[in-house]
Amino acid sequence: MRPTRYIDPHIHMISRTTDDYQRMAFAGCEAISEPAFWAGFDRGTAEGFRDYFRHLTLVEPKRAAQYGNRHYSWLCINAKEAENVGLSRDVIAMIPQFLASPACWASARSA
């Protein structure tokens, strides 16, 4: 019997191994939605966010695809980090360059 197919609406895969992608696919997961999150420390530069957003929109979709999963991401700056107004403005200004990525939820919704 084939498992029930499902979408995981909120999971942080950046901190997981590819074994988890494999297990999720075996269990019937077909798509993953990964929100950006606070890393446990405040990122100090917009470039740190750029690297993180690249990982969410380029690396994770490739890892997920190895097991037949689609990976989508939500890009944002966490409220805790947003206390630094200058950093917040820089991060928010860079987000549009990632919106065209097929792995970005905004792009997937407009298709």
Language model regions located:
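Mid-domain alpha/beta scaffold segments of enzyme catalytic cores
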Residues: 1-111
